[in-house]
Design a protein with these regions (language model features):
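C-terminal active-site rim and adjoining tail of enzyme catalytic domains
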Residues: 19, 94-174
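Metal-dependent phosphodiesterase/phospholipase catalytic core, i.e.
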Residues: 1-92, 112, 119-122, 132-134
Length: 174
């Protein structure tokens, strides 16, 4: 488990392509002089409780990015979305709906106030009307095939998560 490792142990890990992990501060520093957006997913439940969001806001404030529109918080947790609304009300907050929620929450009731709603590719294809629901932008994950990227583009998806950014750029140019 990652939570049981020291930073030194984590830093030595190869996370792919010879890359090592970064501290959040290092990632924020890399973002400073770019036009890139950063989507930060908070994982819950965590052994850290509310400290996770508090520390994230502290680090973003320290980096001068607390009100930067390029920073987006994404989470499957309504609690995390509510915490971020209280701690950083101007920050973009994307609630990620789980696929099983389509069975137990048919009216799509929100227990928090996200600024955008996330949905999986599977759910979006099963329920295309969910794209743009409640008048909010839609974040779609994880879209790696060009035909799915084109489908998302044609159906009004606002943000797309992919493991294939080069493919995405080519797919939307066509």
């Amino acid at each position: 488990r990652v939570s049981r490792k020291t930073w030194e142990e984590l830093r030595r890990l190869d996370i792919g392509g010879g890359q090592s992990m970064l501290l959040f501060d290092e990632l924020l520093e890399m973002l400073q002089d770019t036009q890139h957006h950063l989507y930060v997913e908070t994982k819950h439940p965590s052994g850290q409780g509310d400290i996770l969001e508090e520390q994230m806001v502290l680090r973003l404030r320290y980096a001068g990015l607390i009100d930067d529109p390029r920073i987006h918080i994404i989470s499957f947790s309504h609690h995390a979305i509510r915490r971020m609304q209280n701690l950083a009300p101007h920050m973009d907050r994307i609630y990620l709906r789980r696929d099983w929620e389509r069975h137990v929450n048919r009216p799509d009731v929100m227990l928090s106030k996200p600024t955008a709603l996330g949905v999986s590719l599977l759910r979006a294809k099963l329920q295309p009307a969910i794209i743009g629901a409640q008048g909010l932008p839609t974040y779609l994950w994880t879209v790696d095939k060009p035909e799915d990227m084109k489908w998302a583009w044609a159906n009004g998806v606002d943000m797309l998560a992919t493991n294939q950014p080069e493919v995405a750029l080519h797919a939307i140019e066509l």
